[in-house]
Amino acid sequence: MANNRVKSTNDLELKDRLVAINRVTKVTKGGRTFSFAAIVVVGNEDGIVGWGLGKAGEVTTAIAKGVEAAKKNLIKVPVHKGTIPHEQLAKFGGAQVLIRPASHGTGVKAGGAMRAVLESVGITDVLAKSKGSSNPHNLVKATIAALGELRSPFDVAQNRGVAVEKVFRG
């Protein structure tokens, strides 16, 4: 996998999306204690995306912590004409994700947690399928893993030492 981490977030205009919020109950001798866990995806809708998990006693604090964690976990994704350059399969835990490029006008054909990640990165046309676990934690991580493994045609051509046209035509 190529080094596609984003170093600085100062000049980026990141938009955050809440994927899931989970109320956790801890039973103690004195009664029940409630806390919240929030999965957040941030992206600039131009090829940069990240995810974070925030935990706190209040929902708003958990979301804020998730956003800060997501800003520390950004990757660069090659987006070409609103779609991805090639098909990609990735797994995380019990979740398996397949993302495929789609022609212009198709839209984002993905469900739940995958849709939030794909729209945050700025992909407008893609076909996505999830198998196995539908746990939002694992779906977000598997989708980010699939996007992280994508390579642009220019990178492939440079690694092979051939022209970009040769990559497309074989």
Swiss-Prot record:
Recorded superkingdom: Bacteria
Pfam name, any one: Ribosomal_S5
All copies of domain S5 DRBM, residue ranges: 14-77
Membrane-crossing residue ranges in chain numbering: none
GO biological process assignments: translation
Annotated InterPro entries: Ribosomal_Su5_D2-typ_SF, Ribosomal_uS5, Ribosomal_uS5_bac-type, Ribosomal_uS5_C, Ribosomal_uS5_N, Ribosomal_uS5_N_CS, Ribsml_uS5_D2-typ_fold_subgr
GO molecular-function term, one example from the UniProt record: rRNA binding
Gene3D superfamilies registered for this protein in UniProt: 3.30.160.20, 3.30.230.10
Any one Gene Ontology cellular component term annotated for this protein: small ribosomal subunit
Keyword entries, A-Z: Ribonucleoprotein, Ribosomal protein, RNA-binding, rRNA-binding
Subunit: Part of the 30S ribosomal subunit. Contacts proteins S4 and S8.
UniProt note: domains: The N-terminal domain interacts with the head of the 30S subunit; the C-terminal domain interacts with the body and contacts protein S4. The interaction surface between S4 and S5 is involved in control of translational fidelity.
UniProt-listed HAMAP family: Ribosomal_uS5_B
Function summary: With S4 and S12 plays an important role in translational accuracy. Located at the back of the 30S subunit body where it stabilizes the conformation of the head with respect to the body.
Family that this chain belongs to: Belongs to the universal ribosomal protein uS5 family.
NCBIfam families recorded: rpsE_bact
Name of the protein in its database record: Small ribosomal subunit protein uS5
Gene this protein is translated from: rpsE
